[in-house]
UniProtKB/Swiss-Prot annotation:
GO terms under biological process: D-xylose metabolic process
UniProt-annotated catalytic positions: 54, 57
Residues annotated to bind Mg(2+) 2: 217, 220, 255, 257
Name of the protein: Xylose isomerase
Subunit (UniProt): Homotetramer.
Residues reported to bind Mg(2+) 1: 181, 217, 245, 287
Organism: Streptomyces olivochromogenes
Gene3D superfamilies according to UniProt: Divalent-metal-dependent TIM barrel enzymes (3.20.20.150)
Length: 387
C-alpha cells in the first residue's frame, strides 16, 4: 500500500492548524503568519482533499466589506486552481475579548445577539464555498466559579441559539448540518457540553435534532480520561458522527494538539479500525498544531505526517481484520455471540426458558475464559508490524 495521500482519502486541514504561529500563554509566536492562499496550495501539493476555516482565519477581524470580498476572492481562486474543497466551516467566538464570557451563553445579552449575527454571516459564506457541515465549538461557553453561571439557564440559551440557527438554515434552503464539538476545559475552567455524551443528550432537546450531530476531537475526549474510540462508536451508533477532528494527545493534561498518531498510538489504531470498518464517509479532518519548535518546513512535515500515519494505521487495521488467526480469535472471544440478540424471542420465552436461570450453570460459565489477551496481542503484533 502506498502511504502517499490523494484527494480520494478525504484528508482535510483547518487553516488555523498549519497556520498556528506557535504563540502560547508562555511565549510569543515562533513563525510568521501564513497566507491562506499559500496554505491551500501547499496542502494540495501534499495530497489533501480540502481546507476548513473559522471566519477570522480567512477574513481578519474588523475587515471592511471591500477587504472581506478581496480575501474571499483570492481564497476562492486558490480553491478553483487546486481543486481543493471546503467541506466544513466554523465561527470564531473565542478570540476577541468581547467573547470573554462566551458567545451563545454569555451573561451579556448584547454579546449573545452579536455572536448569532457573526455566526449567521459566516454560515452564508460557508454555503457559498460549498461547505455542508458547520462546526460549533463553545470554547468560552462555561465558567470558573459556581455563582458566575446558572448552568440550567445557560443551556436554555445554548438551545435557543442552535434552534435559531436551525431555523435560519431551513428557511434559507441550505443543505447544512451542525456538528457540536465537545471539550471538558480550556480555555474556560469548565466548558458546557464537555464530552460526546453530553452533546448527544443535548441534541435530543433541540427542535430539529436531525440537523445536529457531533464533531469529536481525539485530544478533547482524552483530556477527560475517556476512551475516544468508544465515544466515536456511540456517535456512530446514534447516527450523529457528522465530522471528526484527528490529532494526538498524551494523557490527561492541556490540549496538546499533536499530529495524528503521536500520543496514544493504540487509541489511534482502534480509531482508524473503527472508522474504516464502520464505513464512515466524512472527511478525515486534522485539527493539530505543529509544535512551536518547528520552522515552516517542519509545519508541512507535520501535516504530511498526519496523513501518512493515518494511512499506515489504515493498512495495519485492514491486515488485522483479514488475518485468519485474528478471525478465529474473535470467535474464541465470542464476538459473534455479542452480535446476536439476547432475547429476540421476547420476555415470555425468556421467562419460560429454564436454561436461562433455573438450570443455568453459573460456575461453568464463570470458568470459561474469554481469550481477550490473545486477541489483544494479535492486534499489537499488527500495530507494531510484527505480522
Amino acid at each position: 500500500m502506498s502511504y502517499q495521500p490523494t484527494p480520494e482519502d478525504r484528508f482535510t486541514f483547518g487553516l488555523w492548524t498549519v497556520g498556528w504561529q506557535g504563540r502560547d500563554p508562555f511565549g510569543d509566536a515562533t513563525r510568521p503568519a501564513l497566507d491562506p492562499v499559500e496554505t491551500v496550495q501547499r496542502l494540495a501539493e501534499l495530497g489533501a482533499h480540502g481546507v476548513t476555516f473559522h471566519d477570522d482565519d480567512l477574513i481578519p477581524f474588523g475587515s471592511s466589506d471591500t477587504e472581506r470580498e478581496s480575501h474571499i476572492k483570492r481564497f476562492r481562486q486558490a480553491l478553483d486552481a487546486t481543486g481543493m474543497t471546503v467541506p466544513m466551516a466554523t465561527t470564531n467566538l473565542f478570540t476577541h475579548p468581547v467573547f470573554k464570557d462566551g458567545g451563545f451563553t454569555a451573561n451579556d445579552r448584547d454579546v449573545r445577539r452579536y455572536a448569532l449575527r457573526k455566526t449567521i454571516r459566516n454560515i452564508d459564506l460557508a454555503v457559498e464555498l460549498g461547505a455542508k457541515t458547520y462546526v460549533a465549538w463553545g470554547g468560552r461557553e462555561g465558567a470558573e466559579s459556581g455563582a458566575a453561571k446558572d448552568v440550567r439557564v445557560a443551556l436554555d440559551r445554548m438551545k435557543e441559539a442552535f434552534d435559531l440557527l436551525g431555523e435560519y438554515v431551513t428557511s434559507q434552503g441550505y443543505d447544512t448540518r451542525f456538528a457540536i464539538e465537545p471539550k471538558p476545559n480550556e480555555p474556560r475552567g469548565d466548558i458546557l457540553l464537555p464530552t460526546v455524551g453530553h452533546a448527544l443528550a443535548f441534541i435530543e432537546r433541540l427542535e430539529r435534532p436531525e440537523l445536529y450531530g457531533v464533531n469529536p476531537e481525539v485530544g478533547h475526549e482524552q483530556m477527560a480520561g475517556l476512551n475516544f474510540p468508544h465515544g466515536i462508536a456511540q456517535a456512530l451508533w446514534a447516527g450523529k458522527l457528522f465530522h471528526i477532528d484527528l490529532n494526538g494527545q498524551s494523557g490527561i493534561k492541556y490540549d496538546q494538539d499533536l499530529r495524528f498518531g503521536a500520543g496514544d498510538l493504540r487509541a489511534a489504531f482502534w480509531l482508524v479500525d473503527l472508522l474504516e470498518s464502520a464505513g464512515y464517509e466524512g472527511p478525515r479532518h486534522f485539527d493539530f498544531k505543529p509544535p512551536r519548535t518547528e520552522d515552516i518546513d517542519g509545519v508541512w512535515a507535520s501535516a504530511a505526517g498526519c496523513m501518512r500515519n493515518y494511512l499506515i494505521l489504515k493498512e495495519r487495521a485492514a491486515a488485522f481484520r483479514a488475518d485468519p488467526e485474528v478471525q478465529e480469535a474473535l470467535r474464541a472471544s465470542r464476538l459473534d455471540e455479542l452480535a446476536q440478540p439476547t432475547a429476540a424471542d421476547g420476555v415470555q420465552e425468556l421467562l419460560a426458558d429454564r436454561t436461562a436461570f433455573e438450570d443455568f450453570d453459573v460456575d461453568a460459565a464463570a470458568a470459561r475464559g474469554m481469550a481477550f489477551e490473545r486477541l489483544d496481542q494479535l492486534a499489537m503484533d499488527h500495530l507494531l508490524g510484527a505480522r
